[in-house]
Amino acid sequence: MSGNRGGSYISGIVPSFKERRPFHERQKDVEEIRSQQPNKVPVIIERFDGERSLPLMDRCKFLVPEHITVAELMSIVRRRLQLHPQQAFFLLVNERSMVSNSMSMSNLYSQERDPDGFVYMVYTSQPAFG
């Protein structure tokens, strides 16, 4: 159960991308991605740790065109999760902040990227945590 470091989709305990990949490997991944596809933003999207009502996605690493907006990315994630239109869904950057839906991914990347070069986002059904 909780000792299963390989991750369990049944229990919902899945190690984060940062836990699975050391910093230098993540940084190398981004360097390769950006050199091969400079118009794409490398994004990691994972389910918020305490989230239980939204499903897990089949993958967490995405290459997003830099010209699309956060709202367009939310639509893509919503479709991948197969959510109903009325189902609550929020994307938080760096597990803490909501950003403007009209912000482009290139602006988000320049403002919020991690030192390893990825933008980290989590999805949740709750906008704030108390």
Swiss-Prot record:
Q: Corresponding gene?
A: lgg-2
Official protein name in the record: Protein lgg-2
Task: Write out the Phosphatidylethanolamine amidated glycine lipidation residues.
Answer: G130
UniProt topology in membrane: Lipid-anchor
Q: Which GO terms describe its biological process?
A: autophagosome assembly; autophagosome maturation; cellular response to nitrogen starvation; cellular response to toxic substance; defense response to Gram-positive bacterium; mitophagy; plasma membrane repair; positive regulation of autophagosome maturation
Q: What family does this belong to?
A: Belongs to the ATG8 family.
Assigned keywords, A-Z? Autophagy, Cell membrane, Cytoplasm, Cytoplasmic vesicle, Lipoprotein, Membrane
Q: Which GO terms describe its molecular function?
A: microtubule binding; phosphatidylethanolamine binding; ubiquitin protein ligase binding
Instruction: Cite the InterPro entries for this sequence.
Output: Atg8-like, Ubiquitin-like_domsf
What does this chain do?
A: Ubiquitin-like modifier involved in the formation of autophagosomal vacuoles (autophagosomes). When lipidated mediates tethering between adjacent membranes and stimulates membrane fusion. Less effective at promoting membrane fusion than lgg-1. Acts upstream of the autophagy protein epg-5 in the aggrephagy pathway, which is the macroautophagic degradation of ubiquitinated protein aggregates, and preferentially interacts with autophagy proteins and substrates containing LIR motifs to mediate autophagosome formation and protein aggregate degradation.
Q: How is it modified after translation?
A: This protein is subject to lipidation. Lipidation is regulated by lgg-1.
SUPFAM superfamilies, per database record: Ubiquitin-like (SSF54236)
Main location as per UniProt: cytoplasm
Give the matching Pfam families. Answer: ATG8
Question: What does the UniProt entry say about where the protein is found?
Answer: Cytoplasmic vesicle, Autophagosome; Cytoplasm; Cell membrane
What quaternary arrangement does the UniProt entry report?
Answer: May interact with vps-39. Interacts with lgg-3; the interaction is direct. Interacts with atg-16.1 (via WD domain) and atg-16.2 (via WD 5-6 repeats); the interactions are direct. Interacts with sepa-1 (via the LIR motifs); the interaction is direct. Interacts with sqst-1 (via the LIR motifs); the interaction is direct. Interacts with epg-2 (via the LIR motifs); the interaction is weak. Interacts with atg-7; the interaction is direct. Interacts with atg-3. The interaction with atg-7 and atg-3 may be required for the lipidation of lgg-2.
This protein's source sits in the domain of life called Eukaryota
